[in-house]
UniProtKB/Swiss-Prot annotation:
It is found in: Cytoplasm. This is Gamma-glutamyl phosphate reductase. Catalyzes the NADPH-dependent reduction of L-glutamate 5-phosphate into L-glutamate 5-semialdehyde and phosphate. The product spontaneously undergoes cyclization to form 1-pyrroline-5-carboxylate. Pathway: Amino-acid biosynthesis; L-proline biosynthesis; L-glutamate 5-semialdehyde from L-glutamate: step 2/2. The gene is proA.
Length: 421
């Protein structure tokens, strides 16, 4: 790491810590004013955003980025519209900061409760998608946190243009510019510095490929909110309603292939497999899904079904590929999910209350569903509004991380001159 990068990141960290103290006492109205003003600045800066993004796209093509990466990098007019609306949606969300709950009188006469407060300074490390700059900045600002955003080098010009709009919004509301800072160096040493400053940064949220997240999880000296994989399952129970099962299993895989809450493995109880798998096989093939199965599922899914390897059961495809396995019991299904899954989202289709309760209790995932598609694992669908990501960890935030997940609780105590005897 060069001294200059370390000095630069230290300056950002110090400024963010100071800004976080201002944000902790900032009113909801003032935060909303900053978000609305940033939205207006984005709207006014469409041409500048397009020009900056064109620079990144040209550099990406010259550097050999594939079409999928270029698509994620592109700031189309529709995506700029989405960013503007995203800022306004966050402004409309309830502010969790300052909420006091569970107030109760203790035998001593004091009142004890919990107050929701910001985490402080949040570092965001992400790749490719410039819209993450807006998503992360808006959620951190509304939850009273200062943020340092380190986007991918391939999006540097786009991120800087977006940052200028955010700074205009902050200035309009009278908030410090350091409340939202975008790292303006492409030197990779900046990431190492950001994740190694516990005196300035309270939590890191990585958004990107598995390699990035594994590196940050391994090297960070501050807590990390993350998920590594989205290996999601649907289990069709012996007591499933067949129509519901087919509908859920179809949607969980084919509504979209790339998201982290898309089903990657379908488990089917042997008692219903002969009725469920043939029609599902037809549906999947019609939608271009490659099927990989165990011996029993291959017989029922028909010609063209490939043999599933051991590696398939623990693979996140993010593609039109599905692993299928026939199991003999609910116990076997739960054991498979807990062994091969990523603790993200898993669903059971069943009419048995007993089986549903067992599945909910024993599957060790951040979201567990009954008779619903895994695609519902989403902050908007859960009523959280926007989300900064999904956490599969068990401490602090778990599942979709919205505004409340970017805060913590502290105990507050009220007395009237009370002393402990």
């Amino acid at each position: 790491m060069t001294e200059s990068v370390l000095d630069y990141m230290t300056r950002l960290g110090h400024a963010a810590r100071e800004a976080s103290r201002v944000l902790a006492r900032t009113s909801t109205a003032q935060k909303n004013r900053a978000l609305e003003a940033a939205a207006a600045a984005l709207d006014d800066a469409r041409e500048a955003l397009a020009a900056a993004n064109a620079q990144d796209l040209a550099a990406g093509r010259a550097g050999g980025l594939d079409e999928a990466m270029l698509d994620r990098l592109a700031l189309t007019p529709a995506r700029i519209d989405e960013m503007i609306e995203g800022l306004r949606q966050v402004a409309r969300l309830p502010d969790p900061v300052g909420e006091i709950r569970d107030m109760r009188y203790m035998p001593s006469g004091i009142q004890v409760g919990k107050m929701r407060v910001p985490l402080g300074v949040i570092g965001i490390v992400y790749e490719s998608r410039p819209n993450v700059t807006i998503d992360a900045a808006s959620l951190c600002l509304k939850s009273g946190n200062a943020t340092i955003l380190r986007g991918g080098s391939e999006a540097i010009h786009s991120n800087q243009a977006i940052a200028r709009c955010i700074r205009l919004g902050l200035a309009e509301a009278g908030l410090p510019a350091a409340a939202v800072q975008v790292v303006e160096t492409t030197d990779r040493a900046a990431v190492g510095a950001l994740i190694g400053m516990p005196e300035f940064v309270d939590v890191i949220v990585p958004r990107g490929g598995k390699g990035l997240i594994e590196r940050i999880s391994r090297e960070a000296k501050v807590p990390v909110i993350k998920h590594l994989d989205g290996i999601c399952h649907v289990y069709i129970d012996s007591a499933a309603d067949l129509d519901k099962a087919i509908r859920v299993a179809d949607n969980a895989k084919t509504q979209r292939f790339a998201p982290c809450n898309t089903m990657e493995t379908l488990l089917v109880h042997a008692a219903i497999a002969a009725r469920a798998l043939p029609p599902l096989g037809e549906i999947y093939r019609a939608k271009g899904v490659e099927l990989r199965g165990c011996p029993r599922s291959r017989e029922l899914l028909g010609p063209g079904t490939l043999e599933a390897s051991e590696e398939d059961w623990s693979s996140e495809y993010n593609a039109p590929i599905l692993s299928v396995r026939v199991v003999d019991s609910l116990d076997e299904a739960i054991a498979h999910i807990n062994r091969y899954g990523s603790h993200h989202t898993d669903a059971i289709v069943t009419e048995s209350f007993t089986d549903a309760r067992r599945f909910l209790a024993e599957v060790d995932s951040s979201s567990v569903m009954v008779n619903a598609s895994t695609r519902f694992a989403d902050g908007f669908e859960y009523g959280l509004g926007a989300e900064i990501g999904i956490s599969t960890d068990k401490l602090h935030a778990r599942g979709p991380v919205g505004l409340e997940g970017l805060t913590s609780e502290k105990y507050v105590v009220f007395g009237d001159g009370h002393v402990r005897g």
